[in-house]
Amino acid sequence: MVSVTRTVFGELPSGGGAVEKFQLRSDQLNVDIISWGCTITALQVKDRQGKASDVVLGFAELEGYLQKQPYFGAVVGRVANRIAKGRFTVDGKEYHLPINREPNSLHGGFRGFDKVLWTPQVLSNGVQFSRVSPDGEEGYPGELKVWVTYTLDGGELVVNYRAQASQTTPVNLTNHSYFNLAGQGSPDIYDHEVTIAADAYLPVDETLIPTGVIAPVEGTAFDLRKPVELGKHLQSYHIHGFDHNFCLKESKEKKFCARVHHAASGRILEVYTTQPGVQFYTGNFLDGTLKGKSGEVYPKHSGFCLETQNWPDAVNQPQFPPILLRPGEEYNHTTWFKFSVA
């Protein structure tokens, strides 16, 4: 059984409207999602002793989400991840996007899908959010109708993304939740054991744009096909963290993507997706300056993201999976976050 409760989370400044919170509850999970950016603000999971902790980074009040912050829990779009120099060409026409992360465009621009109010509809086992992104929003061509649906099934949170375009446009939607399976506010994720089912990854340049090479993980720090303890792994390869796309099998079917196990609590997160990639990000840009829930600060490496996605800069790299959505087609992808204990 899933229950859905609807309350007001806060009011946007200058009469911008009410932001609502939807609490989805099952016997195993409690998930809070707000209509601002379709943002997951809390996710309570039990450990092996039956004690629940909130395992996502974020804020207790709306004000936290309205300040400059690193996309905690939000849906990002129209195109998640980076587009090189904020430029791309569709049908012979060049489009220029705002450069919001020098020298590139990141996560849809200055006012991406994470910074808008969505229209909610309560379902029996979840909530669906919708919006229309107007033609030219943040420089993108065509009007885009978008639906993001969160449903709960026992220990599994399912996120479905659908979109329809009036004109050919790139589309790439993901959720940017930061997880810490020890509980948000724990200082780091070094004791998390990570597995990612990818035989290849995308090397990047100094601005985090893929070089175009699809590199085998074999014999590199990116070989996460067998479980590695994150802290020891980063140390042994002398790397400062991950912020890379891992290449999954390019089928539209549901496939296993990643597994993260926190031995001390027993919590396990498994991710399945229909997407061709996942950005594994270890919170390298977190710096402890933001005050989160219950006054916690979030230093570097205090959370990780598994952003299921198309590959970064795919609109400029024809050898990457296709990212263009044409009129009459439907963008439709699903990601499953499955929680359990061992």
Curated annotation (Swiss-Prot):
One function term, GO molecular function aspect: carbohydrate binding
Enzyme class: isomerase
Residue intervals passing through the bilayer: none
Modified residues (Phosphoserine): 14, 124
SUPFAM superfamilies xrefs: Galactose mutarotase-like
InterPro entries: Ald1_epimerase_CS, Aldose_1-epimerase, Aldose_1/G6P_1-epimerase, Gal_mutarotase_sf_dom, Galactose_mutarotase-like, GH-type_carb-bd
Alphabetically ordered keywords of this record: Carbohydrate metabolism, Cytoplasm, Isomerase, Phosphoprotein
Recorded catalytic activity of this chain's protein: alpha-D-galactose = beta-D-galactose; alpha-D-glucose = beta-D-glucose
Locations listed in the record: Cytoplasm
Family: Belongs to the aldose epimerase family.
Protein name: Galactose mutarotase
